[in-house]
Every structure is written in C-alpha cells, then in structure tokens.
C-alpha cells in the first residue's frame, strides 16, 4: 500500500506540473498508432500505448511522443523490479512498436536505486528524471519546441 500511495502522489505531482507548464490534459484512450497519441502540448493519464500501458503519454512540440512511467522504490532490491523489469522492458516494447525516432520513454523516479540498474535502464533507451526536480522534465519538454 505504501508504494501505491507514493506512486499516486508522484503521478498527481506530474499531472499538476504539466498543467502548470502549459500542457492541456486530454482524455485517456488506447494509442495503438501514433496518430492516436495526444498532439503537441497535450497529455493523457494512464493509457495503453502499443502493447503496454504508460502512466502518462505526452505530445512533444517536435512531433514525438513521450511515454512517462512513474516509479517509486523503497529499497535498492526493489529497484530492479520497478526500473529494469518494468519500465525498461516497456521502453523496449515501445521502441519495437513505434520506432526509436518517434517515442521517448521516460522513467520518473523517487526513492532508492542502484547505480548499475540506472545505467542498465539508460543503456536500454530509457531517459531518467528524478521526481524531486520536475523542473528538469519541464525544461526538457520546452527544448522540444526548437
């Protein structure tokens, strides 16, 4: 239960931060092809993206789609499950479904993670952002306008 509470709070914080940064929230829906994804400047909450669910799907300003997975790990042992066996696997599936130029998988992390698990996830194509500094995520999103 503790993990779910932390994850729920993290997701609400992301939701509020995206809205405060000018993104518009749209209805969740299955995204089986990228033309069904939220358009630039919009996002939806948990939705099927290809074969796997994403916590958030964002339409980036440059036409790509970001898939954000929120993860909370209370121990370095759990970090393998949360990051490598879930979020990084989803990244690989989304790359297969949509291609590496069209989709940007992001793990938004809170808690305790082993360095080698973080490196492994990044090597598999997962961008990592820390939940305590969502300004970093907002700045990155803004850079997709240029």
Please describe what each predicted stretch is.
Residues 1-8, 77, 107-111:
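Short, charged/polar micro-motifs that form catalytic or ligand-binding hotspots
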Residues 1-22:
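Interdomain/boundary linker segments immediately adjacent to catalytic/signaling cores
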Residues 1-3, 39-45, 74-78:
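Surface-exposed cleft-lining segments at the edges of enzyme active sites
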Residues 27-62:
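Active-site metal-binding core of divalent-cation-utilizing nuclease and nuclease-like domains
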Residues 56-58, 62-74, 87:
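Conserved catalytic cores of phosphodiester-cleaving nucleases, focusing on short active-site segments
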Residues 70-85, 110-112:
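Short beta-strand-loop-alpha-helix junction that forms the active-site gateway
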Residues 83-97:
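A short, acidic, amphipathic alpha-helical segment used as a generic capping/interface helix at domain edges
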Residues 102-146:
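Domain-level recognition of nuclease-like catalytic cores that cleave nucleotide substrates
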């Amino acid at each position: 239960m503790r993990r779910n509470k932390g994850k729920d709070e993290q997701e609400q914080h992301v939701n509020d931060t995206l809205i405060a940064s000018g993104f518009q929230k749209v209805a969740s829906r299955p995204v089986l092809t990228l033309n069904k994804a939220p358009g630039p400047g919009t996002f939806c909450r948990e939705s099927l993206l290809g074969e796997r669910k994403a916590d958030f799907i964002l339409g980036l300003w440059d036409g790509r789609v970001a898939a954000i997975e929120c993860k909370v790990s209370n121990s370095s042992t759990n970090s393998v499950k949360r990051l490598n066996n879930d979020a990084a696997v989803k990244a690989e599936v989304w790359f297969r479904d949509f291609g590496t130029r069209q989709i940007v998988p992001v793990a938004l992390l809170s808690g305790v993670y082993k360095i080698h698990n973080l490196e492994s996830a990044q090597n598999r194509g997962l961008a990592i952002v820390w939940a305590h500094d969502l300004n970093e995520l907002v700045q990155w999103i803004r850079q997709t306008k240029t």
